[in-house]
């Protein structure tokens, strides 16, 4: 797919894309209780989660209703994922808790992602692994209810262990510092407690005392990280937008911080009663911000930093190298295509903002990374541009291009 973008000014109201982080967690909750998700958007990552719970015995009706099995067991000996890192990293400890043997594989982008920490941890508790990367055969059953794991590689392992210890009727997790993306662990803890469980997270320890979980019926709330590209598009193009279907920002949840970050850079950016109001200003300020707790915000911040006055610095970027693409290099490449300079340091990237009228009109290949396409499309609204392999947005937000059209973006899709 090729998308051609012409100079446009964004305006209008748009519904935030559903949170894939929340959708995947809700789908995995169907291992324990009935879940009915209204109007579920079937992004590639969500489909990976659906196929995973189906392989563990969950009955799935119309890709929206999920009925737990009487007994959890591995129904399929081979689970093929597409590209969902969240699904993969949560699935590994879950199948280890159920016990048996299963092989997991995925597309090349996921094969490149490290699994070292979860393999190291579970090897100490009765699980055998064929390797520390995909394709991966997992054999055995967790032999302990008290797990130690390093927290530096991915928070998704810890979220998966919370599910695993619910399968084992309780236990504890000790996370060896540093703890990356702690807010996503807190999201999982909060979700289980909302459904009636008893999960406590103090310092670096999580204690799980399961209760019967209540059923859920409703729609998945919007995703601040994905919605931020609509906000970025409005700010870069000189427009305004209102983004709806967002839950109230939590103090702990990193992605919500984008509302405040854009405001600190000089934009009108306010949340009120489920709506995020965004309006462009004539100029934006540079910023220094640490994104270790919310790495998915890097490209939105980089996009606005490209046209901000002065030099911005995004720190805490180490884990950007193990996303769908090497996002540190992807940010540098996209910025360079638009004529914006940048410099990578040991754990930060400097972005040297320019007047937006000086932005180039390049051709950008999305590098099989949905956020590359979204960042580039926002910058292209100033002087135009072309996105190739533009179908990559289907990983998280299949409706992205149509949404831009509804916001008065001038684009053609080939």
From Swiss-Prot:
It is an enzyme of class 2 (transferase). One of its GO terms (molecular function) is 3-phosphoshikimate 1-carboxyvinyltransferase activity. The keyword Transferase applies. CDD domains: EPSP_synthase. It holds the Pfam family EPSP_synthase. Its main location: cytoplasm. It catalyses: 3-phosphoshikimate + phosphoenolpyruvate = 5-O-(1-carboxyvinyl)-3-phosphoshikimate + phosphate. PROSITE patterns: EPSP_SYNTHASE_1, EPSP_SYNTHASE_2. Transmembrane segments: none annotated. 3-phosphoshikimate binds at residues 20-21, 25, 154-156, 181, 296, 323. It is found in: Cytoplasm. Monomer. This is 3-phosphoshikimate 1-carboxyvinyltransferase.
């Amino acid at each position: 797919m090729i998308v051609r973008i012409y100079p446009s000014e964004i305006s209008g109201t748009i519904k935030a894309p559903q949170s894939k982080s929340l959708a995947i967690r809700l789908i995995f909750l169907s291992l324990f209780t009935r879940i009915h998700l209204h109007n579920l958007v079937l992004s590639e990552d969500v489909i990976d989660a659906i196929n995973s719970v189906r392989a563990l015995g969950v009955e799935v009706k119309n890709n929206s209703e999920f009925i737990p099995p009487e007994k959890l067991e591995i129904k399929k000996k081979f689970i093929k994922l597409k590209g969902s890192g969240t699904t993969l990293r949560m699935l590994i400890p879950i199948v280890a808790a159920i016990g048996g043997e299963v092989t997991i594989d995925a597309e090349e982008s996921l094969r490149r992602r490290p699994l070292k920490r979860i393999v190291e941890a579970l090897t100490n508790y009765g699980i055998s692994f064929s390797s520390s990367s995909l394709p991966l055969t997992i054999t055995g059953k967790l032999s302990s209810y008290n797990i130690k794991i390093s927290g530096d590689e991915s928070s998704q392992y810890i979220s998966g262990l919370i599910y695993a210890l619910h399968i084992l009727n309780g236990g504890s997790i000790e996370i060896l510092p540093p703890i990356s993306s702690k807010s996503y662990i807190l999201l999982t803890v909060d979700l289980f407690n909302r459904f009636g469980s008893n999960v406590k997270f103090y310092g670096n320890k999580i204690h799980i005392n399961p209760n019967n979980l209540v059923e859920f019926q409703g729609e998945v709330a919007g995703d601040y990280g994905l919605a931020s590209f609509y906000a970025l598009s409005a700010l870069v193009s000189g427009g305004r937008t209102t983004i709806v279907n967002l839950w109230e920002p939590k103090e702990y949840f990193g992605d919500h911080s984008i509302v405040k970050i854009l405001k600190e850079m000089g934009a009108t950016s306010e949340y009120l009663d489920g709506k995020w109001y965004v309006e462009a200003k004539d100029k934006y300020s540079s910023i220094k911000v640490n994104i270790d707790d919310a790495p998915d915000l890097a490209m939105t911040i980089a996009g606005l930093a490209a046209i901000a006055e002065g030099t911005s610095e995004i720190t805490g970027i180490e884990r950007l190298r193990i996303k769908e693409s090497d996002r540190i290099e992807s940010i540098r490449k996209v910025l360079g295509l638009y004529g914006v300079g940048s410099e990578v340091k040991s754990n930060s990237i400097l972005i040297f903002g320019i007047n937006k009228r000086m932005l180039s009109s390049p051709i950008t290949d999305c590098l099989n990374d949905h956020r590359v396409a979204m960042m580039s499309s926002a910058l292209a609204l100033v002087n135009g541009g072309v996105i190739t392999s533009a179908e990559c947005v289907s990983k998280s937000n299949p409706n992205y291009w149509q949404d831009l059209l509804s916001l008065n973006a001038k684009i053609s899709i080939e």
